[in-house]
Amino acid sequence: RSPSRGLGDVYKRQALILCAGFGKRLNPLTEKIPKPLLELNNVTLLENCINLVIKLGIKKIFLNTFHLSDLIISFIKKKNFQIEIQIVEDGKEILDTGGGILNMMKKSSDEDFIIFNPDTLWNKTYHEEIIKMQNFYFSNKLNNALLLTNKTLSCLLYTSPSPRDGLL
């Protein structure tokens, strides 16, 4: 599981981007537009997230959809991002966060993922923090890691022991 790349290098892992939710807290905005396609400064939240993933050097994105999935799929096709993006539809009912992640993981042969919520506002300093998190994750052979930020925008890293029975 330990990558052959040296610390400080970006690991060419896969990203999972969670785009299936209803965005209920942003109603009525999200009744006709999925939350990942809402714009800030003429850039969608999803595009901002994908651009960060590309900057990290990741080669493939799994993107789950459910609510207004046709709009997200159309957006991805129209933008023609310079990265492989595989759409994974939740199916007939929404799988929630854990189910969506598990569904995407089943589509990949890789065992390490970086998971993104597109409604997180990523600024330029997060690129460095994500690389630090990856380095810490691999050098310490962790089972999972979570990057957090506080009101002062200083980043924190949370890790936990192995999940029991394979549960998160």
Predicted features along the sequence, with ranges:
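Conserved N-terminal catalytic core of the sugar/cofactor nucleotidyltransferase
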Residues: 13, 17, 43-117, 128
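N-terminal nucleotide-binding beta1-loop-alpha1 segment
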Residues: 9-31, 56
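Active-site metal-binding loops of divalent metal-dependent hydrolases
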Residues: 22, 119-120
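Short clusters of hydrophobic/aromatic residues that line enzyme substrate/ligand-binding pockets
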Residues: 26-29, 37, 95, 160
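Conserved core of the sugar-phosphate nucleotidyltransferase
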Residues: 123-164
